[in-house]
Regions:
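Membrane-helix interface segments
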Residues: 76-78, 110-115, 153-158
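Short helix- or helix-capping micro-motifs
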Residues: 114-123
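TM-lumen/periplasm interface segments of multi-pass membrane proteins
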Residues: 1-111, 130
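Short acidic/glycine- and proline-prone juxtamembrane loop motifs at membrane-interface regions
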Residues: 129-138
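Alpha-helical transmembrane segments of multipass membrane proteins
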Residues: 66-70, 127, 143-147
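Hydrophobic alpha-helical transmembrane segments of polytopic
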Residues: 2-6, 118-119, 141
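Transmembrane helices and adjacent periplasmic/lumenal helix-loop junctions
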Residues: 160-162
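Specific aromatic-rich, kink-prone transmembrane helix
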Residues: 139-157
Length: 162
């Protein structure tokens, strides 16, 4: 049931906003190009990467290029779809973490159900909708910060993900 709701929630912003259409995830493509440049041994910062006639620089730290390198091995469309699905799942998990922190007396199941109901609304909010349309990592970074700061029993030392 949760999987079905997540799938519906993933497409809801497009249905509400502009109807079903696929966005070109321009930022995701820059991440891929940075990963490709790293794998090829190219300098990340001496050239721009052309995306739809727009020249964009790779503005992320070198570690990001290393982390983005696996994206160069998969087709753009599969990577963009995977990024969208991972972002939606991460957003759901962020809502669960915040709900657990804000409503500590409830069972974990209650937090997951609440997150499932909140997720479709969260997906149509402009910052989240644009994160999805550009293929950005914002929600993934937020998830890392929340896991690092609000998890009750962290499995890594605090501060690792920040």
């Amino acid at each position: 049931m949760i999987a079905v709701l997540l799938a519906v929630a993933a497409v809801l912003p497009w249905i509400i906003d502009e109807g079903p259409r696929w966005y070109y995830h321009i930022d995701f493509d820059v991440y891929r190009k940075g990963g490709e440049a790293f794998l090829a041994g190219d300098n990340l910062y001496t050239r721009d990467y052309e995306m739809l006639g727009i020249n964009l620089p790779f503005t992320y730290p070198p570690l990001a290029a290393i982390l983005f390198a696996p994206l160069a091995w998969i087709p753009f469309s599969i990577g963009a779809l995977a990024m969208t699905l991972v972002t939606v799942a991460a957003l759901w998990w962020c809502i669960v973490i915040v709900a657990r922190h804000a409503l500590p007396g409830r069972a974990l199941t209650d937090h997951r159900v609440l997150a499932t109901w909140i997720l479709p609304v969260a997906l149509v909010i402009e910052p989240v909708r644009e994160t999805l349309s550009f293929g950005q990592v914002n929600v993934l970074l937020m998830a890392m910060v929340l896991v690092d700061t609000l998890t009750r029993r962290p499995w890594l030392p605090r501060g690792v993900f920040i």
